[in-house]
Amino acid sequence: MAPGLDLTPDFHPPTTTTTTTNNAPPQQRTLLLAPPTLATHGEARLATLFTTTYPRATTDLQMLDRLAAGLVTLPATTYDLVLVLTDPDGSRRAEAAALLADRAVWARLVPAVRAGGRVASEEGGGEGTEFLGDQRVGREAVLAGLVAGGVGGFVKPEYAEEEAVPLRFGKKKAAAAAAAAVSSAGPAVGTVKVATATSAGKKEEVGMVPPAVAAAAAAPAGVGFVDFSDDLDLDVEDDEDVIDEETLLTEEDLWRPIQQPPECQPQPGKKRRACKDCTCGLASRMEAEDKARRAKADSDLNTLKLKSEDLNELDFTVQGKTGSCGSCYLGDAFRCSDCPYIGLPAFKPGEEVKIVNNAIQL
């Protein structure tokens, strides 16, 4: 075997890793909101702003109309200043105010502003909640969570982080204070033996605990008693005024027509129906009408019912005798459903009808 050379180093120096921490504050970023006309007729002015006042590296430009249409998504908590470009003379103020009066624009804009960031206009000014000379724009900004700034515009407030604070009732401290309050003579005694004038020289036990304290000590643990006769020293008059509900409505209110909700109005060609949770009285009125209609139908039906003594057999074989309808002899086509001559052929009034061998003989 041919000899070989080991070229790996025998000395391994320790390797150290250096970690650099960047504690520098975040870079200030600015968002410029431009009306649509500024993009078509203000290219030179935008170039001047980027070269003189707002560096392009830390400045973003968005169009107000695209933001209002929801075509732009802004990064969250990014901008320290949101500047609405309206020209120093305010020539584009009305155009920008018309777009910022939409609540959806502020809903997309405010989350992109950092805590403590400002929303201002290029022309400045504005008192109170007025922004771009329009109270509506300022109202929408306040409803979105901004507060009016002192130098015009609005500021996003810095809210402190929520922190849970435990509630301690100090039961241990109260128990320690009660134990320290006991005198050095020992614990309190409940009864003592003393000689009285009526005891004839004998000592009697006398209670040293007040009755109220003794009753409270005799109560079981965890059970409380409420004295409903105690008014807690509140100045409450016994003769409280009770409002009569019948006096809340006047005669004019009672005669006023009921305003029918739109959902209760019947559709064309359909019968009016009441809602499940009807409160206008339509359901009760329709129920009363149904009951009255059913009662009338029952009464009409009872008038048509005949008793057993009224159902006398009518002899059609006698000349001149006819049924109540007068058409029994004409045939089944003219007979009632309960006619006893159903199935018989037509015959003449007074004609004798015989049945021989289950065959009808006229």
UniProtKB/Swiss-Prot annotation:
Q: Where is the composition biased (Low complexity)?
A: 15-28
**Region feature Disordered, mapped onto this chain:** 1-28
Which residue ranges does the record annotate as region Fe-S binding site A? Answer: 264-280
The entry marks the following residues as binding [4Fe-4S] cluster, namely 325, 328, 336, 339
Q: Write down any Gene Ontology CC term.
A: mitochondrial intermembrane space
Q: Where, in this chain's numbering, is [2Fe-2S] cluster bound? A: 264, 275, 278, 280
Q: Which cofactor does it need?
A: [2Fe-2S] cluster; [4Fe-4S] cluster
Q: Which GO terms describe its biological process?
A: iron-sulfur cluster assembly
Q: Where is this region: Linker?
A: 166-254
Span(s) of short sequence motif Cx2C motif 2 = 336-339
- Keywords, ordered alphabetically: 2Fe-2S, 4Fe-4S, Cytoplasm, Iron, Iron-sulfur, Metal-binding, Mitochondrion
Intracellular or extracellular location(s): Cytoplasm; Mitochondrion intermembrane space
Signal peptide residue numbers: none
Superkingdom of the organism of origin: Eukaryota
Q: Where is this region: N-terminal SAM-like domain?
A: 24-165
Assigned protein family: Belongs to the anamorsin family.
Function summary:
Component of the cytosolic iron-sulfur (Fe-S) protein assembly (CIA) machinery required for the maturation of extramitochondrial Fe-S proteins. Part of an electron transfer chain functioning in an early step of cytosolic Fe-S biogenesis, facilitating the de novo assembly of a [4Fe-4S] cluster on the scaffold complex CFD1-NBP35. Electrons are transferred to DRE2 from NADPH via the FAD- and FMN-containing protein TAH18.
What UniProt notes about the protein's domains is:
The C-terminal domain binds 2 Fe-S clusters but is otherwise mostly in an intrinsically disordered conformation. The N-terminal domain has structural similarity with S-adenosyl-L-methionine-dependent methyltransferases, but does not bind S-adenosyl-L-methionine. It is required for correct assembly of the 2 Fe-S clusters.
Q: What is this protein called?
A: Fe-S cluster assembly protein DRE2
What organism does this protein naturally occur in?
Chaetomium globosum (strain ATCC 6205 / CBS 148.51 / DSM 1962 / NBRC 6347 / NRRL 1970)
What gene is behind this protein? DRE2
